[in-house]
Amino acid sequence: MEKQIEDRIFKIAFKKLKSSVYYDKTQLILRNDIVRYEQNSKDKIDSKLESLCTQFNDDNKFEKLKELIKRSISISAFPKKLIKSQTPGVIINKQTSQTTVNQNQYFIDMCVEGHILGVVWLMTIGYKLDKLVYEKSYGNRIRKKLINELSDEPTFSPYLFEPYFMQYESWRDTALDEAKKYLHQKNDVMILTMDLKRYFYSVDVTQNAFDKMLEDAGIDKSDKAKCGLVKLN
């Protein structure tokens, strides 16, 4: 029999989703969707999350939920970079008839239920994959205290990821400290930085590669008695 996910996991996931969006200034659309998700319901939010959990655990209801989420998915594009004016150094208050966008920033537009399931995935599967990531990789790392070490269950803390600014400072300071160490040894040092531009728009993870990651993390998709999370993948 497939192991089911308890409704409290969905409640924790929603709390973490709200916290993550609150601190992310780029997620204005999702922030507004969450407000509507809480307001446009006759039931209390706990009852709504319990209902979502029931839909997830019931195979027949889950198929309808999956279709609902898939139909809700679209892409929102916002200007990231504009083409610069051809008259550098000249400031005028005349409005141009058209602004040319050089690059867009894309965001997934999806129903709140889909985002909640995404956080449930992070709490039950994603954190195991995160443990396999190179320790000096700092971007979007899952909180080390996301899972209680004693109970092996997600904590009720609202935080999901390590704060990016702290991760960035660690990346920067570690590199500079290493360079100073060699300078004190009278060695020459050169610091190079590289940026993989628009990485998330171009990366293509195949199903085989993803299955290999799950295997490396000790997640057996075929063992439903121990892993009732197959649906999340």
Sequence positions of predicted segments:
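Non-catalytic, polymerase-adjacent accessory regions of viral genome-replication enzymes
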Residues: 1-97, 101
